[in-house]
C-alpha cells in the first residue's frame, strides 16, 4: 500500500479535504514555509536578514483544475525578460493594485491579465498564509478550483508557457527534493525543498506554497 499522498489503495478525495481545510479562511499572517524546517541558528539569522522590513502586498491564484483523472495544479513559466523571478515556475499573480478590493480580486485580475483565465470558470475556496519573498513581496495565495473548458490567452510579455501537474504528484513526498542554494551576498546557503516535474523544476516560493498546502492536507491530517 502506498502512503496517503500516493493513495492507490485508498484514493483520497483531495477536493473534499481542501474544502474542509480552507473553506471560509481569510488572508492571514506571513509564513516562510518554503524553507525546510529545522534551519540552523546561523542559517536562520542570515535568512531573516534578506527580507525587506516593509514588503509589497501581492497575491497569486493557486488554480486547481478539476480534471476527470483528479485535481491538477495550473502553473506558469514566467517570461525570461521579467525583472523579478524571470523564467521561473510560478502561479499567476502580482502586486495588489489600488483598484483591487482585496487579495482575491487582485489574484483573479492577474490571472485574467497574464493567462486569460476567465473568472467564470473559477471558484475561490480560501487562502493559505502569506509568504514573504526575498524579492520584496508579501504574497497571499488564493486557492481555487477551476472547471475544465477554459481557454488560455497568454500575455507573452509576462508568461512564456503554462502546464499542469497532478496534485497527487505534488502531495507525494517521494517527489520532494531538499537542496541548498545561495541567497544574498556572501557564501551562506539555505535549504529549500524543490518539486522536480519532468524537465521543469518547481522551487522557491511556488514550491513553498504547494508544500504549505501539502502539510495542511496531508501531514496535519495524518497527525489527527
State what each model feature region is.
Residues 1-90, 95-113, 117-140, 145-149, ...:
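N-terminal leader/linker segments that precede catalytic domains of diphosphate-processing enzymes
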Residues 154-198:
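NUDIX/MutT-family hydrolases
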